[in-house]
Amino acid sequence: MKPPSIFNLFKKILDINSSKSKHIKKLISSGVKIVDINSVYIEDSVEILPGSVILPSTFLLGETKIESDSVIGPNTTISNSKIGKGSKVLYSIITDSKIGNNNQIGPFTYVRESTFTDSNVQLGNFVEVKTSNIGKESKSKHLAYIGDVKLENNVNIGAGTVVANFDGKTKHETSIKENVFIGSNSTIISPVIINSNSVVGAGSVVTKNVLSKETVVGNPARKLRK
């Protein structure tokens, strides 16, 4: 049996949407802008507030709620999640999570189950987040894995950073306090606490707690001597 062609998939979406046109028309009449109703799939259970824009090839599933003035898509799937006011989600997947106000998600971000972000968070290309809390103004813009982390406000996660949360048997949590800077290509071996206003130098491997206002570098990461 041949796999369905992209044309058949779009025909299926069109057929489904024709039966759901009442819900889509209701959304449009309420002030939601849907750029191409023939390429999106929006389940009846989805709530979208006025002022939001839904771009082509977007799938909105389950108990999803999109707050006002958000831009979703293109090529985005959101399932059982809440997207805060004024947020933008581009070429990304979000499942079972809550995104705060004025977030920028994507392109190519994967936000997995039980993730919560505060306001003004930025998660960029090829960043995966799972079961984590991300504080306001924090950012991870490139090529990172953040799993089982409590991330406080104004934290910068450099490109290539990995939080190694699984030891082969058990998942462990890491806590990163406010105003922490994590340099590129760092590895954080959970469970550790990286305290406020500290710096982890590029390429470091963190295996122990980092004190407040401390700078650590190396493998394993040690306090930088001045």
Located regions from the model:
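Terminal amphipathic alpha-helical/low-complexity segments used for targeting or macromolecular assembly
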Residues: 1-39, 43-46, 51, 69, ...
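Flexible, glycine/small-residue-enriched loop-and-beta-strand segment within the central core
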Residues: 17, 21-24, 38, 54-194, ...
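Short coil/turn connectors at secondary-structure junctions
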Residues: 177, 211-212
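Leucine-rich solenoid repeat scaffolds
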Residues: 205-207
